Amino acid sequence: MPNQETSDVSQCLTTAVDWAAWLRRWDTQQTGYLPEREARFNAMLDVLEVLLPENFVALDLACGPGAISQRLLSRFPKARCVAVDLDPVLLTMGQAVLGDMGGRLRWVDADLMAPEWVGRLGESQIDAALSTTALHWLAPEYLTRIYRELGQLVRPGGVFLNGDNLKFGPHLPSFQKVAQTMKEQTHTDAFERRGLEDWENWWKALQAEASLKALFAEREKRFAWKAAERHAPIFDLHVAALRNGGFREIGVIWQHMENRVLMAVR
């Protein structure tokens, strides 16, 4: 478990690599999987524009290199954001490229599966929590606990937004078939026909950077649990867990196949 907001390993490596170029490559490969990626970001930010005051505080949950934070703070000049993640490589990239965005962005190195992550945020309450393409990694028991914690952290009237591949349940096999078929077609077009760099090749290429050996060793240690078999929580579980966590309005505000933005108002 990290014991400081930015790891010592990350701090010493931010100038050794062209992180801006790697972030551009990251965005390109992510868009290969999700052609509607920017539309999904915009839909999430539209919600904040309608529901929140200008000077709100947001949590970028499982932030990676800070894609949400970057877009949110660019659109809302009076907002602040706390970006939290466990991946030392992506945190390093985000900090190197984005910095603190004029003192409005703070990075936190913490493990969402450990209960003490909330105490490391430095915020007693927030106006909004947002996450994209991340929480599907969590086993149901961790996801339900995190939603309970968010139910305490997000102020009444605040909002949680999760943009992710939220699967249809087993009672909807035709829906599952359509969504899976279209996803496979999207991937074939992006990575075979157009030859875009995919997730695995992006990571392999970055790992070949000689100066990042220690950083990747730390990453491997932190994510050893990912080698185990996992089952991504289906959409219905997310809804039930948010309701049990104290959110009063829950529904899909944007969707393309299984790619949805689940919105929950506290």
Language-model-detected regions and their locations in the chain:
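Conserved class I S-adenosyl-L-methionine
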Residues: P2-L52, A67-R71, L161-G195
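Class I SAM-dependent methyltransferase SAM/SAH-binding core
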Residues: L59, S69-P115
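Class I SAM-dependent methyltransferase "Motif I" SAM/SAH-binding loop
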Residues: A62-G66
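A conserved beta-strand element that flanks and buttresses the S-adenosyl-L-methionine
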Residues: L130
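A short glycine-rich, Lys/Arg-flanked "PGG" loop and its adjoining helix->strand segment in the class I
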Residues: T144-P156
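Short alpha-helix
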Residues: R230-G245
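Core SAM-dependent methyltransferase catalytic element
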Residues: G245-R266
